[in-house]
Curated annotation (Swiss-Prot):
Belongs to the MAD2 family. Gene3D superfamilies: HORMA domain (3.30.900.10). It is found in: Nucleus. The lineage of its organism: Eukaryota, Viridiplantae, Streptophyta, Embryophyta, Tracheophyta. GO terms for biological process: cell division; mitotic spindle assembly checkpoint signaling. PROSITE patterns: HORMA. Disulfide bonds: none annotated. Coiled coil: none annotated. GO terms for cellular component: cytoplasm; kinetochore; nucleoplasm. This is Mitotic spindle checkpoint protein MAD2. InterPro entries: HORMA_dom (IPR003511), HORMA_dom_sf (IPR036570), Mad2-like (IPR045091). Required for the execution of the mitotic checkpoint which monitors the process of kinetochore-spindle attachment and delays the onset of anaphase when this process is not complete. It inhibits the activity of the anaphase promoting complex by sequestering CDC20 until all chromosomes are aligned at the metaphase plate.
Length: 208
C-alpha cells in the first residue's frame, strides 16, 4: 500500500504539462463565466479540484479552449512556454479592459535530463483551489464590465518555437496605467504558475 500511494506523488514532465494545461482550460472557463463574457445560461456545472466549476456549452468556445489546451500542453512539455494571457476586450472598440496573466517558470533540468519530481496530488489541488476561489470572487476586487466583451489568448513562447497556422503574431494588448492584483500561485515542482490580473482603472477611481 505504501508504494502505491508514493507512486502518486511522482510528477513527470508530461504529467506536469497536462496538469497546467488542464488548469488553464478550467481557469479560462471560470474567468469567462465570472466576468460575464458569455451568458450565465451557456455554462454548466461540473466538479473539479474539489470545487463546483463552470464550463461553457458554447461549441465554438469549447473547441477553441480544447485546441488551445492541447497546444499549450505540447509547448509546456517542450519547456517552451513562458506565459499565457487571457485578454478581455470591449466588443465595440477592442479596448483592452483586463489581462489575466499566467506566468510559467519551468525547471530546465527536467526538460533537459528527464528528471522527475515529487509532490502530492492533494497539495497541488489545494494550491489550484486557492486560485480558482480567487477567480470566482473577482467581482469583489474588479470593476464591473458593463458592456459586451470578447476575449483572446496570447501565448509567450521561446523565440525558436514554430507556431501552428492557427496562431498569429500579436501585439501585447496592454492597458495604460493598469491596476494590478496578484493572485495565488501553484507549483508542480516542474512548472510554477504565478497569476496576476491587470485591469483598466474605473472612471470613478480616476475622478478621486
Amino acid at each position: 500500500m505504501a508504494s502505491r500511494s508514493a507512486s502518486k506523488d511522482i510528477i513527470t514532465l508530461r504529467g506536469s504539462a497536462a496538469i497546467v494545461s488542464e488548469f488553464f482550460g478550467y481557469a479560462a472557463n471560470s474567468i469567462l463565466y465570472n466576468r460575464a463574457v458569455y451568458p450565465e445560461e451557456s455554462f454548466s456545472k461540473v466538479k473539479k479540484y474539489g470545487l463546483t466549476m463552470l464550463l461553457t456549452q458554447d461549441e465554438g468556445v469549447k473547441n477553441f479552449i480544447a485546441s488551445l489546451t492541447s497546444q499549450l500542453s505540447e509547448w509546456l512539455e517542450a519547456g517552451k512556454l513562458q506565459r499565457i494571457v487571457l485578454v478581455i476586450m470591449s466588443k465595440a472598440t477592442s479596448e483592452v479592459l483586463e489581462r489575466w496573466n499566467f506566468n510559467i517558470v519551468t525547471d530546465a533540468e527536467v526538460v533537459e535530463k528527464g528528471a522527475i519530481k515529487e509532490k502530492s496530488d492533494k497539495e497541488i489541488m489545494r494550491e489550484i483551489q486557492a486560485i480558482m476561489r480567487q477567480i470566482a470572487s473577482c467581482i469583489t476586487y474588479l470593476p464591473c464590465l458593463d458592456e459586451p466583451c470578447v476575449f483572446d489568448v496570447l501565448a509567450y513562447t521561446d523565440t525558436d518555437v514554430d507556431a501552428p497556422g492557427t496562431w498569429v503574431e500579436s501585439d501585447a494588448k496592454l492597458i495604460d496605467n493598469p491596476q494590478m492584483v496578484k493572485l495565488h500561485s501553484f507549483d508542480t515542482k516542474i512548472h510554477k504558475v504565478d497569476t496576476l490580473v491587470s485591469y483598466k482603472k474605473d472612471e470613478w477611481d480616476e475622478e478621486e
